[in-house]
Amino acid sequence: MSMHIDGKKITEMYWGGRKIREAWYGGERVFSGSKPVEVMPPISGSNWDARDWLRSKLKEYGENYQTVTEIPFEIDTGEATSMRGMFALCSSLTVVPEMDTSRVDNMAYMFSTCESLTTVPPMDTRNVTNMAYMFRNARNITYIPDLSTGGVRSLGYMFYGCARLTDGNVRLIGKRSFAAVGGMIERSGLTREPFYNSSGRPI
């Protein structure tokens, strides 16, 4: 939910001359820091609803998904289980907001063709089963925080085209038996599939 006055979204709030960090209404956070909060619906499955929702919200803020450099709102993702393609083709995006991903099981194509990203925030991926094409053609990404991948079934083409991502700058913790990894590191800067055990040793 975001807050409006005369049809315009509130981007800053003050009380007694001081900027307000958070505002709540009816038990729901509607404003955080200097950005409003948008609540992502309980999206699930293998469709493109997460992508379509984000693009629709960006349009409400006068932004285009291909040219936006920073998301102009915080995203409450606590009810979502799919982020398939959420930021796909956001080719000018340089910053990804921190999000609650604890319930998410599908991250396929999530950052596909995010050509301006150099990193992403830490993500809880314990419940994720699909990471296929997740960073495909994110050609300028150089570092990815550790991702839990013990339950992931599909990792095909995950880092395809990540030319600046090199060994040691991404660690996938755990590998499921018979996980699909075809094309995982093709055309990337990686020389091996970046799987590690919980002790930090390569698998």
Region locations from a protein language model:
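Negatively charged
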Residues: 2-12, 16-203
